[in-house]
């Protein structure tokens, strides 16, 4: 099973309109999406937070958590965790792992494509980072995020909506402008 196919990638980033055969395949390789599909297939039998642990172990990521810092996470009530997103999905997995260790009901606003990971679907509120906040593909996610907070459930947000990129004009890696909804 694949998390994302060439066709889905092409549609999501509007490559399908360019009529350039092979470009989606090339991007799947360059963006390591084929590797992600392989790692998922190897761990698809694991559910929930143990799935995150298996993925992190599979890709060789270790995390050290200061137990004293975990005490800063409110034990009840809604809050919003805001994080940068420099590398991609890894930040989402780590944020889920850390916050859910204290608040198992935590939800994360995430790219709608991540909803294809059935092992973690319960944790995601899908939005489309390739569209504006007012786009039909994001309105449902925004409503669900507001309901989540009203219900006292904590929510994680990556306000840039996409991974950081290298800006040649600034000679550094930067986030895209944050969504005005967050900051």
Predicted regions: what they are:
Residues 1-82, 92-94, 101-103, 121-122:
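Membrane-anchoring hydrophobic helices of lipid-metabolizing enzymes
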């Amino acid at each position: 099973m694949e998390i994302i196919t060439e066709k889905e990638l092409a549609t999501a980033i509007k490559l399908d309109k360019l009529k350039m055969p092979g470009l989606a395949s090339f991007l799947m390789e360059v963006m390591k999406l084929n590797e992600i599909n392989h790692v998922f297939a190897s761990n698809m039998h694991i559910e929930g937070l143990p799935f995150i642990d298996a993925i992190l172990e599979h890709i060789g990521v270790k995390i050290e958590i200061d137990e004293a810092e975990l005490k800063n996470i409110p034990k009840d009530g809604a809050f919003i965790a805001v994080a940068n997103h420099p590398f991609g999905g890894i930040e989402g997995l780590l944020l889920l792992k850390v916050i859910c260790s204290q608040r198992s009901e935590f939800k994360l606003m995430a790219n709608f494509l991540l909803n294809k990971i059935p092992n973690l679907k319960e944790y995601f509120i899908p939005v489309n980072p390739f569209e504006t906040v007012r786009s039909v593909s994001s309105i449902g996610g925004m409503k669900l995020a507001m309901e989540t907070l009203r219900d006292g459930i904590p929510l994680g947000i990556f306000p840039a909506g996409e991974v950081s990129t290298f800006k040649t004009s600034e000679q550094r890696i930067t986030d895209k402008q944050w969504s005005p909804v967050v900051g």
